[in-house]
Amino acid sequence: MLQPKRTKFRKQFKGRIHGTAKGGTNLDFGGFGLKALEPNRVTAREIEAARRAITREMKRAGRVWIRIFPDLPVTSKPTEVRMGKGKGAVDYWAARVKPGRIMFEIDGVSEETAREALRLGAAKLSVRTRFVQRIAE
């Protein structure tokens, strides 16, 4: 699963996800993509599950680009532990996703295959998404 090799600090504040995506809103690599329609945190497990579903449907043909990276450490305290005594240990890594962000791109397959692959991948994610494709020039 994806996670940073090293970070400046082990733990981060929770933060809020305001506004729409400033960058990463256009298809830069592939011909088809999956665009987020709502703000949310997407975990590294979700990203990996979606990647597997997409590559399986594409039958190893074409190419997949993951445009988001889980760089936010999410902490949790063990069960039945009283409040206080510091912040919990890092439980998993997540990526903050804003509306308009392209999360996955694929190329080298037909539109029907791309549509079905991204539909299966979107089912693994905790955000509503839309299928997008490059405008023929």
Curated annotation (Swiss-Prot):
InterPro entries the record matches: Ribosomal_uL16 (IPR047873), Ribosomal_uL16_bact-type (IPR000114), Ribosomal_uL16_CS (IPR020798), Ribosomal_uL16_dom (IPR016180), Ribosomal_uL16_sf (IPR036920)
Cited SUPFAM superfamilies: Ribosomal protein L16p/L10e
Cystine connections: none
Gene3D superfamilies membership: Ribosomal protein L10e/L16
Family as reported in the entry's similarity comment: Belongs to the universal ribosomal protein uL16 family.
Subunit and partners: Part of the 50S ribosomal subunit.
Protein name: Large ribosomal subunit protein uL16
Protein's organism: Mesorhizobium japonicum (strain LMG 29417 / CECT 9101 / MAFF 303099) (Mesorhizobium loti (strain MAFF 303099))
Gene that produces this protein: rplP
